[in-house]
Amino acid sequence: TYNYYLTEAEKTDIAGSNLSVDRLAEGADVSDYKFKERSNAFYIEADNIEVFNCSILSSQDTLGRNGSTNYGYHAYFNGCTIGGNVDYICGEFAAVFDNCKLQWKTYKNDENNNAKIGYIVAPKTSPYVFRNCEVTTDGAHGDIAVLGKYGRTWGANSNASFIECETNGYIDSEGWTEMSNGEKASAIFNEYNNTNK
């Protein structure tokens, strides 16, 4: 992951609920699309993590872990806002997300009129389950027409499910894609009873 530096919370070893972690590259105008980079705000490096009512924001690779080794990590998120634009929840860990806001990061000057296609997830083989979550935008640049996908593969056997989620018109009709040719055929991608107001 690029543009990685410590937040104040990490410097003082703070963990808990009701945190706000916003990954910003020092000296960069992060509302400008040209500064979009991979930058973890929350990196999974432990088992049995529980996160409640936290705001976890960045652009790409906001929440997750890089690498292909499956260490059997498990995480639970409830009532959180998790934001980004590209694969902003990604990597090899199993997770359940209940009642979370999945927030598209918007940019003031991207080349597609602030409607840059993004991907919420890029899972490996461990499943991500989203229940009663809502897809939103950050609203930073007005009410723009963001249209993205639930996710894309990150290798064979990617696994993600969205159950009874509200997409607010921010997910395109295809819903899913792949990072490399042929991976989608072995992916386990599910949608159940989602709404699109």
For each feature predicted by the language model, list its residue ranges.
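Sequence-level preference for short, compositionally simple segments enriched
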Residues: T1-K197
